[in-house]
Every structure is written in structure tokens, then in C-alpha cells.
Swiss-Prot record:
Belongs to the dUTPase family. PANTHER family: DEOXYURIDINE 5'-TRIPHOSPHATE NUCLEOTIDOHYDROLASE. Its cofactor is Mg(2+). One of its GO terms (biological process) is dUMP biosynthetic process. GO terms for molecular function: dUTP diphosphatase activity; magnesium ion binding. InterPro entries: dUTPase, dUTPase-like, dUTPase-like_sf, dUTPase_trimeric. The gene is dut. Substrate binds at R71, S72, G73, N84, L88, I89, D90, M98. This is Deoxyuridine 5'-triphosphate nucleotidohydrolase. Keywords: Hydrolase, Magnesium, Metal-binding, Nucleotide metabolism. It catalyses: dUTP + H2O = dUMP + diphosphate + H(+).
Length: 153
């Protein structure tokens, strides 16, 4: 399925010295976002920093949202994950895309100019109408069982 998403380049280096975000393969779900920083930066252990991507998007469809997700290699190998765990970009947001990076490791990490720091996935969104009830219609096997209710493994 092809869809159009409006974007603005906020950093003039994007598409020139810094590669434009793109899908790595035909089957990639996530578009890699790059660090549009002036100079390489160190993220100290336990530190969280906001990193600009050099662009803004406007989805312009309440049936869509963008999710910013960590890159698996950065998280697994270096402990670099998103400070907010998942970034949610609403369809009516038009501001700069920023990535909150958190170094959860015990080693400092050097972010280089133009480095792939997160990935963006466009997802469908439903906005259901909620109906207040006194009791739910059909009881389920799980019922009100919450955290850990279905077993330990």
C-alpha cells in the first residue's frame, strides 16, 4: 500500500551531508531516523538527551499515527533505548521530530553526526466510541486477572 506523508526538512544538511531517512529493505517496517546534531555527542551512563532528526512530518489523517522505536542493535549492543520507551506522533502534530535517547548501560556512548538513532513506523489508529456499562456482557476465562495472572512462563 502506498500513501503520501508530508514532510519538511528542518536541517539543510539532511539529504546532503546527512542521508535522508529511508527504508533499508523492501520489507522494512521502520524508516531509520538520523541524528541531525552539530557535532558528535556523548551520552553518559544513565543520561537522557533529546536528539533532533532534522525533519517534521504531518500525517494529516486521524486514522494514522507514527511510532518512534529504538533500533534493536543500539539497545542490545550499547544500551541506547528511547527515554520515553516509545514515541507517539499524533496525526495532527507538525513540529520537529525529536528522539529521546537514554543510555541505560554503564558505558558512555558516542552518537555521531548522521547516525541512525531510531526508527519510525506508521500505524493505523482507531478512535472508538466508549460506552459506559455497569457490568460487561459475557464473562471471559481471564476475567479481571491482571499482571502475572496467566502464569510465570
Amino acid at each position: 500500500m502506498t500513501m503520501q506523508v508530508q514532510y519538511k526538512i528542518l536541517d539543510p544538511r539532511l539529504g546532503k551531508e546527512i542521508e535522508m531517512p529511508h527504508y533499508g529493505t523492501k520489507g522494512s517496517a521502520g524508516l531509520d531516523l538520523r541524528a541531525c546534531i552539530e557535532n558528535d555527542m556523548i551520552i553518559e551512563p544513565g543520561q537522557t538527551v533529546l536528539i533532533p532528526t532534522g525533519m517534521a512530518i504531518h500525517l494529516d489523517d486521524p486514522g494514522l499515527a507514527a511510532m518512534l522505536l529504538p533500533r534493536s542493535g543500539l539497545g542490545h549492543k550499547h544500551g541506547i533505548v528511547l527515554g520515553n520507551l516509545v514515541g507517539l506522533i499524533d496525526s495532527d502534530y507538525q513540529g520537529p521530530l525529536m528522539v529521546s535517547c537514554w543510555n541505560r548501560s554503564e558505558e558512555a556512548y558516542n552518537v555521531t553526526v548522521g547516525e541512525r538513532i531510531a526508527q519510525m513506523v506508521i500505524v493505523p489508529v482507531l478512535q472508538p466510541v466508549f460506552t459506559q456499562v455497569e457490568e460487561f456482557g459475557d464473562a471471559t476465562e481471564r476475567g479481571e486477572g491482571g499482571f502475572g495472572h496467566t502464569g510465570s512462563h
